[in-house]
Amino acid sequence: MTMVGLIWAQATSGVIGRGGDIPWRLPEDQAHFREITMGHTIVMGRRTWDSLPAKVRPLPGRRNVVLSRQADFMASGAEVVGSLEEALTSPETWVIGGGQVYALALPYATRCEVTEVDIGLPREAGDALAPVLDETWRGETGEWRFSRSGLRYRLYSYHRS
């Protein structure tokens, strides 16, 4: 059976993206993301794929799978699938965004790795928002740390059976 995990960074307001981009830079979160996902399958939506810089697309060291409703969509270096179930064929799969793909994958997930960024970013119309975890999830919260970028952040690890 496939272990499905979700991984994201969010502002304290729950915003994960604005205008097709991540509105902060946190090198420590990028390193954490790389450590968690390296060697595994990563699943993302088309907009997340498009938001990756061309020089790192596909993300190296991982099987990149793009979920798209467009049957003719091409993603050089990645597999394109039409359903989440088609993507869940590896022993460990990490969903990396965006908001719609997180919502589809949440019922399958048993792990969530979350970076909370302490940044004043009120919600606006059109923002991509983090999934809401219900009472079936149990988590461990890390201490607040300071990034080299000057932002404060902390890591959460959530699990459910």
Curated annotation (Swiss-Prot):
Organism listed in the record: Mycobacterium tuberculosis (strain ATCC 25618 / H37Rv)
EC nos: 1.5.1.3
The reaction(s) this protein catalyses: (6S)-5,6,7,8-tetrahydrofolate + NADP(+) = 7,8-dihydrofolate + NADPH + H(+)
Swiss-Prot/TrEMBL keywords: NADP, One-carbon metabolism, Oxidoreductase
Coiled-coil annotated spans: none
Top-rank EC class of the record's enzyme: oxidoreductase
Name the record gives this protein: Dihydrofolate reductase
Binding site for substrate: 7-9, 29, 34, 62, 102, 115
The family this protein is said to belong to: Belongs to the dihydrofolate reductase family.
Positions that bind NADP(+): 8-9, 16-21, 45-48, 67-70, 82, 96-101
GO molecular function: dihydrofolate reductase activity; NADP binding; NADP+ binding
Annotated function: Key enzyme in folate metabolism. Catalyzes an essential reaction for de novo glycine and purine synthesis, and for DNA precursor synthesis.
